[in-house]
Amino acid sequence: MAIFQGPHAYVSPGWYENHPAVPTWNYAVVHAHGRARMMDEAELHDLVIRLSDSYEAGREKPWRAAQLPGPFVNAMLQAITGFVIEVERLEGKFKLSQNRPAEVPRVIAALEAAGEAELAALMRNHPPPAKG
């Protein structure tokens, strides 16, 4: 299983208008279940080159791994572990204060004030479903 953690942050009960309340943690996460295998050296090298080329594309002076001495590249690759996972099942979970829909705007504002803009945006874009 591989875990992909999205934005997450502490939520203070002091942010709520309604009490009693306790602290909690809001988060977004995906668990990818499947068979994993380690990449061999050639696969890893190819992947790093393709990723670098992709991110460098369109730059005025794109950096190329070919500019580096082979021994340096090989030493850097030793510090990277590459794996491939054949995904059989994905499990995603969002805990975004859905149990307190009236408090969500206050939590979003407090998260933004605390510098947690990514989580605040996720909550704004995925509001709790309306009751009814």
Label for each model-derived stretch:
Residues 1-47:
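Short, structured beta-strand-loop surface elements
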Residues 38-132:
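C-terminal edge-of-domain segments
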